[in-house]
Amino acid sequence: LPKLGENEVYRCIKAVDLAPVLGSLGGLQWTRAGQTGKYPCDVVIKKALPREIMALIEGLDLGGTLARAVLRRLAPRQDIPPHVDDWMPAEADWRRFQVPLVTHPDVVMRWPDDGVSVHLEPGFLYEVRYDRTHEVVHGADCERIHLQIDQVNATI
């Protein structure tokens, strides 16, 4: 698939079997992350991801090079405020993918300037725009755990 078009902010790419990875979530060592002025959340970065998660990433066949992978956990009802991820190098062909692992229909990803709101369902691979204003509105009483993958020169 080509990268997202100018008028697209997300795309559901394919189904993903989560069974091999869900059991590995319980024993993870989460780290509190968040810079001044940014939202705090719990993360597990690439070097600490269990082999089950790394195998899932490899099995997605994204092509290109894995630049960054992180599990991001939000507490119940914890939102991510509107922001643009502008820290990625402009000269690289970065694409962002999300695999929701634990979520709820009341957790919505929004691109307010584009008028798009969507619940990213677990068990699917999505490509999402990070270079437009986006946010997460978390209206549920459960955690939200997503695998976020930044890939350079992806060919999927």
Please place each PLM-identified region on the residue numbering.
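Short beta-strand His + acidic residue motifs that chelate non-heme Fe in jelly-roll/DSBH
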Residues: 81-83, 107-110, 118, 128-129, ...
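Short, surface-exposed charged micro-motifs
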Residues: 70, 98, 135
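Tight coil/turn sites that cap or link beta-strands
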Residues: 76-78, 123, 131
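Conserved short histidine dyad/triad with adjacent acidic residue
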Residues: 70-91
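Short, conserved beta-strand element in jelly-roll/cupin
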Residues: 73, 90-107
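A short hydrophobic beta-strand segment most commonly corresponding to one strand
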Residues: 95-100, 125-127, 141-156
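A short beta-strand-loop-beta hairpin characteristic of the jelly-roll/cupin
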Residues: 100-122
